């Protein structure tokens, strides 16, 4: 896990790299902070440092962090790329992010993922998702299209009532081309 960056008192959080093979979020957050050191946002550039270093979805224990949250729909699953761990919140990264959320009590959370090119939301985040969609040109989807037991979105957005947006970036697009729309999204979040 990397350090928390930006404004540690912010009520808007942005999280990158739940999955190590989706490094776009880490890069975009780091680039944004180079030009906006006085940000109003709280950033966690990389939740899954091991995954990024090894270019794998899971953490060092083979757990998909986005299936490891203590939700009503968490299930013990087979050990594959979507393995949710031996039990909910078994991973240090999951405990870390839960602690930050509980401590900061954010009013909005944005997580950066890839590759689906959609703005997915959990909880009361449709309006802001539509504004993000207008910036990046991706459709807004309430469902990602498949089951996500133990996901962060379910834990934060549905069960804890914190509007949570999962921005699924285009992995085929050069990450440099994503800077302009994603930075505009960060600026939008700075002003809510």
Where are the language model's segments positioned?
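Beta-strand secondary-structure signal
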Residues: 1-2, 42, 166
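Active-site/substrate-binding loop(s) of hydrolase catalytic cores
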Residues: 9-15, 21-145, 152, 162
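Short beta-strand-to-loop junctions in surface cap/lid or active-site-entrance loops
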Residues: 1-10
């Amino acid at each position: 896990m990397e350090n928390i960056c930006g404004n540690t008192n912010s009520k808007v959080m942005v999280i990158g790299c739940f999955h190590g093979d989706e490094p776009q979020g880490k890069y975009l957050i780091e680039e944004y902070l180079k030009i906006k050191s006085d940000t109003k946002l709280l950033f966690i550039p990389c939740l899954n440092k091991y995954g990024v270093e090894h270019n794998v979805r899971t953490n060092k224990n083979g757990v998909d962090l986005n299936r490891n949250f203590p939700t009503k729909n968490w299930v013990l699953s087979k050990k594959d790329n979507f393995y949710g761990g031996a039990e909910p919140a078994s991973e240090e990264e999951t405990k870390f992010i839960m602690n930050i959320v509980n401590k900061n009590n954010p009013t909005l959370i944005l997580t950066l993922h890839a590759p689906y090119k959609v703005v997915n939301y959990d909880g009361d985040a449709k309006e802001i998702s539509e504004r993000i969609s207008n910036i990046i040109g991706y459709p807004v989807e309430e469902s990602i299209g498949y089951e996500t037991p133990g996901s962060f979105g379910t834990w934060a957005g549905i069960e804890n009532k914190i509007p949570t947006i999962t921005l699924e970036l285009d992995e085929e697009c050069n990450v440099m081309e994503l800077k302009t729309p994603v930075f505009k999204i960060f600026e939008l979040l700075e002003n809510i």
